[in-house]
Amino acid sequence: MSEQDFREIARNGLWRNNPGLVQLLGLCPLLGTSNSTVNALGLGLATMLVLACSNAAVSLVRGAVSEAIRLPAFVMIIAVLTTCIELLMQAWTYELYQVLGIFIPLITTNCVILGRAEAFAAKNGVLRASFDGLLMGLGFALVLLVLGGLRELLGQGTLLADMHLLFGPAAADWKIQPFPQYQGFLLAILPPGAFIMLGLLIALKNRIDESLAERAKVQAGDVPATQRQRVRVTGVIE
């Protein structure tokens, strides 16, 4: 796989075709667990691992699975990998596993994972499929993390609270409280706040894309005549 392929897959996963901001897949866990940084990071990492491993596994068996049973086979692969992640979390981060609850098993039914298995992994080699899964998972995890951080900051006035649930006792002092007297904003950590914050993130991304597209047109010289500035003989722009 060429360097250009790597860059294209990275751009798609992290920005142009981001699962959370563009495809709008996996909204149930995205909105349900993003009320704090630690919850968002925990589920994001779990989803990223399952997505990368499932893409690799699907790519390996794609030639041995018939068209008739392809989707059930893919779901079984995803379910096995999700169970492995679930067991690891029970062993190493049990308190966080209890907090996330049903959202860990629900990784099996996450449309992001099944969608990439069907649309990409089943049609590409192991290396491309693994990298696509890793970058799509990373893009999803980053949206989760940003959303969780913003909601925690607005809702509780803290950042990185309870990180010991994921990283152990050494992370107990990671908590940041920028505004000690802040009383919190309850709406931010409730489901309606999740919808509002996600909508704002999507709007911000769309605005950035529009600005980049306009800049590219200007640099390419493809600007409508009505928008061009007239330049006098003196060289001064009107």
UniProtKB/Swiss-Prot annotation:
HAMAP family: RsxE_RnfE. It is a multi-pass membrane protein. The chain crosses the membrane at residues 41-61, 71-91, 95-115, 130-150, 184-204. This is Ion-translocating oxidoreductase complex subunit E. It is found in: Cell inner membrane. Pfam families: Rnf-Nqr. The lineage of its organism: Bacteria, Pseudomonadati, Pseudomonadota, Gammaproteobacteria, Pseudomonadales. Its EC number is 7.-.-.-. GO terms for cellular component: plasma membrane. It comes from Pseudomonas aeruginosa (strain LESB58). The complex is composed of six subunits: RnfA, RnfB, RnfC, RnfD, RnfE and RnfG. Belongs to the NqrDE/RnfAE family. The gene is rnfE. GO terms for biological process: electron transport chain.
